[in-house]
Amino acid sequence: GRRAPSGGNTQLTHFMVITNQDVLSELVTLVQEEYGKMPITENTLPYMVNIIKMSAEGKFVFNYGAPVLIVLASKPSYANNFADVSCAMQNMMLACNELELGSCWVNQIRHLQDNERIQAKMRELGLGEDEKVYASLAIGYPDLPNGLNRREIEPKGYKVTYVD
């Protein structure tokens, strides 16, 4: 991720690598508790309905039990923050794939970053006062009988327009 391109080569992305299992467990509990408090309305996206319900039941583990979580942050005032973080995330996911590791981009901390409890925990872990979380990457060994699933996935959408 640290070799990913950044706008103007600013390299402002902050990588918080969390491997401490107690800290990961705390984050899972915090995320679960805060999602579990959310109301479900007619405007709640279907995937969020499941997350909220599972959280309320104490069954939502946002990092899928992975032993590593890399949280990427940047300055909200920096115009390319999300683009830079996205480049770093993609590079790390490709590297994980090459190393036969499973990876999953998880957004729960980003979605909850204005939550006081989540914000306090992230600050305690090293998030700067002038930073916000833009993405998190869960990394671990795939829990599959034959390791990493290497199946081809057909694109479902992504409109492409060619202009000659």
What does each of the following model-derived ranges do?
Residues 1, 70, 75-121:
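Small-aliphatic-rich amphipathic alpha-helix that forms the alpha element of a beta-alpha
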Residues 1-2, 137:
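Short alpha-helical scaffolding segments that buttress acidic/His motifs in well-ordered protein cores
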Residues 3-8:
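Glycine-rich phosphate/pyrophosphate-binding beta-alpha loops
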Residues 11, 15-84:
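Glycine/small-residue-rich phosphate/adenosyl-binding loop
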Residues 32-33, 86-89, 153-155:
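Short, solvent-exposed amphipathic alpha-helical segments in soluble enzyme
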Residues 55-57, 127-164:
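C-terminal helix-cap and adjacent tail motif
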Residues 65-68, 101, 129-133:
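Short coil/turn connectors at secondary-structure junctions
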